[in-house]
Amino acid sequence: MILLLDIGNTSIYMGISDGKTIIDTYRMNTEIEKTPDEYYATLKSFFDITQITDLAISSVVPRVTEAFKKIGHKYFHKAPLIVGPGVKTGVNIKTDNPKEVGGDLICDAAAIEHNDKPTLIIDLGTANKFIYVKNKTITGVIISTGIQVSRQALIGNTALLPDIDIITPPKVLGTNTIQCMQSGLTYGTAALIDGLVERIQEEVNEAFDVILTGGLSIIIQDLCKTPMIREPRLVLKGLLNIYLRNN
């Protein structure tokens, strides 16, 4: 079995694959100070670690990447595949500096390698990423503040605003502080998506599919006016495609 790891700034999204499909997924917090042995112990609490024979990693947190590299060498006696320079991805990158494009964006694009139609991937995470892919090429990206970061900014930089759960309030116009904040985060994100999709459409002047992914996509999808498909495992599917391309 292959352990797929998408290491983000807030959480680590994991999948177990038999090399054909993703069988199960798990999520744990990203903790910079955690040691390789501590991470390994956490992995064992999720699934039978003895079934794992290989690791594939996409990461935007170098320090945690190093921890999992050590796990690979110490416990599995092999180097994990890490998305980066020298790894065959099947994705071309048409940007000013391709090296600065994150592994998670590349995995998202690699997941739609069989889609011949231009596609906008919207990945809602610590940062919201809008990735335009055409002919297996990333041609442009938008990055905005993610919902959790916006929530933390509201709470941390104001004296009177309370902590809140990220849920959809009953109406767009709130009648109490909690609902007002929830509306700004949920309906505000949906409006951001709809507005940027419209502007991208004006710029590219062609029809494209829209795929929504990321941990909070389940909350946001129904609030958007834009027709879209939700694919929560997109980044792991792309990481699996990249792993198979290199093995």
Tell where the protein language model's regions lie, with residue ranges:
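Short coil/turn connectors at secondary-structure junctions
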Residues: 1, 77-78, 116-118, 126-128, ...
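Glycine-rich phosphate-binding loop plus the immediately following alpha-helix
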Residues: 31-35, 101-103, 108-109, 113-116, ...
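Glycine-rich phosphate-binding loop signature in dinucleotide/nucleotide-binding domains
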Residues: 48-51, 115-117, 203-206
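Short beta-strand-loop/turn "lid" adjacent to the catalytic site in phosphate-handling enzymes
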Residues: 49-101, 136-140, 144-147, 178-179, ...
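Long hydrophobic alpha-helical segments typical of transmembrane helices together
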Residues: 203-247
